[in-house]
Structure formats: structure tokens, C-alpha cells
Amino acid sequence: MSYHLHISPETRFLRLPGSFLLDSGERLRDVEIAYRTWGALAPARDNAVVVCHALTGSADVDRWWGRLLGGERALDPATDFVIAANLLGSCYGTTGPASPRAPGGPPWGGDFPAITVRDQVRLQQRLLDALGVERVRLVVGGSLGGMVALEWALGDPGRVEALAVLSAPAGHGPWGIALSELGRRALALDPKFRGGHYPADDPPEAGLALARAIAMTSYRSRPGFEQRFGRDRRDGRFEVVRYLEHQGRKLVDRFDANSYLALTRAMDTHDVARGRGEYAEVLAGVDVPALVVASH
């Protein structure tokens, strides 16, 4: 499958010179960042808004947060320089498992190095440096993007003026890690997975669909499932089962299994207290206006 078919023609690319140092100590060479922008950078270089996408998202904010983007909306290109970068490890243009390990060579596949949420912030910092951004008026993101947004405020506090974190914790807890691990194991059990070295035209679709279905059970609360689905049936099958199958099918048509593994493992690393102290004191150190929104 060519994931580039899902990358909008407006996407731009930045190739970093030299190598990019990961949290793990490994270095990635020839890292490319796929990104999009709306609006223009002000002469004072202080009107940037960084938008961080969720697990299987892309830099195309207009596709998934289109209602927030536009004139007199939350993300207004008339006043804001809106920047969105595809996350490291994804399959929508930024370097990831589907990228060549070396120019002209085979893809990384299952050998792609481990990445963290903090790696995402450092990579986005490199992008903003290249774009000439000095101050960030707002960093906003949901789910995995919310984790990245929170790390922005801690990893580059002098640059960020405000923060909006949607449906993201200060640390990815054991329940979330357990569900992600179940999904990863389901994916790996697909015979087509082949240790992460599957051909692009024959990916482990069944495993990825099941991993997605497992994850979807955590994207709503139990009352949310009761309210939406109840015990309703259609054609003899429970609506909730049809919903899970539908979500799985949708993902396999557009996302890479190895990217799913890489990014869920990155989520597992999210812990603002790691190497910084206790949660309360670390979060108290975020001294910019912050909007935190929980989901139900």
C-alpha cells in the first residue's frame, strides 16, 4: 500500500542535515519532516500555533479539525501561523518504518528504532527553528497529540505562551499500556506480519484491524458505549460489534502496521515526571495558561 496517496499535495517536506539524536541514544540519519502551514509568520516571529495530531493522524489539520480552522475560528490563518507536522514514526511523510533505511534501500520495517514523545517535541523544535519561529502562541493537541503538547510546555518552556491539552494524561498509565500491548500482540500474531518485514502490497490487515478494535474500546467510557449502542442489533449482529469491525477496516485502508506499533510504544513512554521529579511539582512548573479537556 502506498501511504503517500493519503498525503495532501499541499504538504511540505524538510530534510534535516546530519543526524537526529533519539532519547534512546540512537541516531537517525536523513530524517524528513512532513508538515503543513496556514497563514504567515508575523515580522515579530511570535504568532505560531503548533497543532499536534493524534495516533493515526497526519499534518492535514483541515481534514480532521476543519471546523476549528479558518477565518474567525480557533485557528485563524488571518492572525495565526498554524503549523502541523506529521509525527516521527508515522506513515504520512515524516520518517517512519515505511521509509527507506538508506537512500534507495528497503524500508526500516520492524527494525525502526524506538521513539518517545519527547523525541517528537525535539523534532518539531527543529522544524520551527528552520521556519524561523521564535515564540509559539499556542500548542494544542489531542490524545497522543495532547501528550506531545504537554511535553512542549515542559521541554521548551521559554518558547510556549499557552497550552491546550485534549484527552491526554500526564503519564500513560498501566491500563492504557495494557490495552496497547494487547493490540500489539494481536497484530504480531497475524501470519502476514512477518516480524515487521511484510511487503507493502500484503500487509497484516487482520492483525491491524483487531488492534484498532481493541483500542476503540478505550476511546469511549462504559456509559458512552451504553448510550450509543445499548444492546441494539442489526441483521442479527450487535451494533457495537459492527462499529468495532468498521473502525478496524477503515484503519487498514490508510495506515501502516509498523507505524501503529512505533507510535503506540511511543505513547507508553509518556511520563512528564520521568527524570524531573514528582507529578505535582512537575505540573506546577507549567507556568503558562493551560486548557485541559477530558473526554467521556
Give the ranges of each region predicted by the language model.
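Catalytic-loop region of hydrolases
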Residues: M1-A48
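Alpha/beta-hydrolase-fold enzymes
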Residues: R159, V165-K250
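Conserved hydrolase catalytic core segment
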Residues: R135-A178
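N-terminal cap/lid subdomain of alpha/beta-hydrolase-fold enzymes
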Residues: R36-A102
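Active-site nucleophile elbow and catalytic-triad environment of alpha/beta-hydrolase enzymes
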Residues: H246-Q247, A262-V282
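Residue-level signal for short, function-critical loop segments
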Residues: P169, A294-H296
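Cap/lid segment of the alpha/beta-hydrolase catalytic domain
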Residues: R73-L128, I177, E181-G195
